[in-house]
Amino acid sequence: KKIIKKARVYRALGVINETELRYKKKKKWNYNVKDQGWRYHMSDINAAIGITQLKRFTELASKRQAIAKKYDDYFKKYKNLVTVFSRDYKKEVPHIYCLIINKPINRNYLRSELLYKNIETGVHYKPGYYLDYYKSDKKFFPNCEKVQKKIITLPLHPGLTNNDIKKITKTLLNLLKK
C-alpha cells in the first residue's frame, strides 16, 4: 500500500495531501509538493494502442526472443564479439541487443558504415557521468569508459526477418574483417 500511495504522488507531479480526493472530483485544493514527481497521465489514444499491443504481447515477445537467440548463436563463434546480455530467453524478453566489440576499431565509423548499408544501430547506454544531471569525473569509472567505446546495439524488433538477421550479422562481420 505504501508503494501504491507513493506511485500516486509521483504520477501527479509530486503533489501530496488530498491528492486522492482531487481524483475523485471532490476538488479539495489544499496541497503541497515535497518531492519530484512527473506527469504520468496517458491519453486515450495511447491507452488504445497499449491495449492492442498487450493483445499481441505473446507474439511480439516470442519474436524478440527468437531474434536475440539467433544473434547469440551466431556471435558465440567469434571471440572478439561479446554478447552483453546472454539470457534464458524463455523467461526474459530483450528490448535491445548489445555487443561489445573486443577489437581495435572506431565504433562510430563502424556504425556509419552499417548505416550506409541500411542497418541502423545504437549505443546503449551512454555512461551516466556523461549526462549533465549526473556529471562526475570519468576517472572514477575506467572500465565503463573502456566498454562504452566498444559497445554497439543491433536492430531487435519483431519485424526483422531471417534475411534481415543474416544481412546484419554478415555485414557486421565483413566490416570487422577490414
Residue spans for each PLM region:
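PLP-dependent aminotransferase class I/II
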Residues: 2-178
